[in-house]
Amino acid sequence: KVFRRLFEEVVRQCIEKGLVSGRVVGADSTHVRANASRASEELVEVAEEVGVYWERLDDYEEEGLEELERRTGKRRKKRTKQLKRDNRRSHKRVSRTDPEAGHMKRPGKPEGPHYLAHQAVDGDYGIIVGQTVTAGDVNDSVPYLDLMEQIHTNVVPIQSATADAAYDFPLAHRVLGELGIDFFVRPQKTAARVSVQFTRDDFYRDENRDVYLCPGGKELRLKRLARSASGLFWEYQADQRDCALCPLRDKCLREDDKRGARKVSVSYFAADRQRNLERRYSPEYRDALKLRQVWCEGSFSAQKREHNLARILRRGL
């Protein structure tokens, strides 16, 4: 708490002196080694806890259900509480020496028990305005919105935020937009999640009729609002009779597809993401990404080179 108060006071003085404006705030993370070896890790079964991300989706799901009723006249029963009661469990590597550390395994990074330092840096002079720490197996996107909201509310009003592709998740575009924050993020490359020839890009979106048209010219109509651990999705589905007689069926459906009809899923926040990414070739967008690279990556580089961050060992959050 003492170090936190010192940090906040330094940031306050930087704001008073005009060194921090909130015009562009970049975010990134770097790994910090835990004071534990890989030999101390063991595979254990853990219960998946309902995280903050899941809690955030509650309000948006209710909003989406009301919109679904307006658009289709249908309303499915909300299943959020049911999903929260599910005792879903998974296996993860946990260190006996430091159980709070997380097993990090990322391309180009050292593998083993680590922590992640998540930092937000003001783009004027590279002043760090916010920081949080998580276990090394936590995705960068998990603490991001809480960190940005805390800075925006308690430190300095943020005009625009910038981040790399790890932070390009649909909910961020919606939440930051509602806060009045422009979001300049490097687009995340998305791979097709279907094992057939036709992907979602092969389906034409007809905004006026609120349908998707398949390569065979048949309509996929809005059926429901689906929810998973990764977010909220509109589900559009074709008529089974159309798919049964379609000459392109083998390119669109797997042989073992039990539905017998093609489905297309679209993020509930897709419009917010698209609105931001439409500006990705503008000078303002490109300049913000450059500032993030210079100040965020440069700040971590300086901390590792001059302040021993590359060699320090941590134990416990």
Model regions: which residues?
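Anion-binding and metal-coordination hotspots
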Residues: 1-317
